[in-house]
Amino acid sequence: LLHVGLQQILLMDRVPASAAVSTAVELAKRERLQRLAPVVNGVLRAAVRAVEAGESLPVPSDPQKRLALEHSLPDWLVAELWGQIGPERTEALAAASNRIPPLDLRCNRLRSSREALLENLPAVALEELPDGLTLTSRAGPLPQLAGFSEGQWCVQDRAAQRIAPLLDPQPGQRVLDACAAPGGKTTHIAELMGDQGEVVAVDVAPRRLQQVSANAERLGLRCIRTEAADATDLTEWEAESFDRVLLDVPCSGLGTLARHADARWNLKPDGIEELVGLQHQLLEQGARLLKPDGRLVYATCTVHPAENTGVVEAFVEENPDWQFSEPPLQLWPDPQGGDGFFAAVLSRRR
């Protein structure tokens, strides 16, 4: 309650200080904290007096600790990023992590066109993406917007829309999406293939695959087949049996903190190291399943080098018959919209 009250008093201009104090006190009484209500009242009124007197909160002199405090990030995470990507990138990421992300859509080119959607939706085109648009206003629940029930579009961040095209999937091919749920990239792959061929969507959680199937059904995509399996152990699957492999691996999610406000507090210093081990396993398994002339995309929604270039460069070094097909893609969280993503395209040397 004190945190909420101080947030309103210090940072929210539209909430009168008196209302912030009285609301917090009333909530304390309702939540069986009646004996502490005078404490809440006293602390918040003292804060109001300090603000009116022109006083400000003490700010740490250390730039890393100040950044962590100002943007509500764990101290260890700021220190880690500061050392890995530098102060400027860390400051930009911290600022972007507290913005309200825009709501981006991807046009289902098999059922509509971006031009047609723009005529019926409060949206503008994302010029850098052939099928992307972003809503300019939210009027009611998404399922009530034009074209939703007809499967003409789905929700997908503009950065995520950059991943599936890197596979360059072709009609008639067999494609593996090894960490598929909830299915945004799975359905994008199927659309790019003209719904011709087979997209095998794998996830370790059967319930999450139900969401993949539901999305595919709404979008009218028939080439998607779901299979519950642990993608770190696909040794029983036939080697070199897929034309394309997408590995959108589990990661720290540092590129999507704006969408998951609590994620920053769930991360642990040793968690990234554990994730890197998992990512290595997934890459080894996915590579084994790719045909000799195929194309593999390793992707994350993080900006941590250990999970990105660290994983793929180690793989290429350990497997000399593999190479980068093109320079890796690093997208940084953008305050104007767009999550942080990384993608590397790998193939066997000919």
Q: What does each model-identified segment do?
A:
Residues L1-R350:
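S-adenosylmethionine
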